[in-house]
Amino acid sequence: AHIWLTDDNGSPLIGEYSMPTRLGSTELKSFNHSVWIPTDHNTGKLTGTRLHVPIRFEKEIDRLTPYLFRAVCQGRVLKEAVIKMYKINEAGIEVEYFNIILENVKITQISPVLFPVGIASKHMEEVEIRYESIEWKYTDGNIMFKDSWNERVIA
């Protein structure tokens, strides 16, 4: 997976990836996110509306790192983050198949991570982000769903 970020002024924050189809992105080494809805443990009935857990990912420390620290330290809201996921198709070609588009993104935590010698050769960082809206898009068939905190959802 790769991420592209746009700052609060609408300018791209350029990552170090230089492959033409991923130019300016940053590779995500790990990614974790979930959405859940509260339910009664005995009956299974819904007791509230959906809740989004912050997105957490791990990436190599790179040219984006100071921009991410600036965003968290100054409370800046990034205009957009786009995460694109890839897979190998039946013909053996790598293709983009899933996107996550986030709007009004807040960097809420950055933690540099240094692994013991021999476990990883790169210096890494864990990043946590929150957002105002999220859209999930499966590219084959253009199947998508968008959720926004500004829209009231009744369970």
Regions found by a protein language model. Give the residues of each.
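Glycine-rich, low-complexity intrinsically disordered segments
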Residues: 1-155
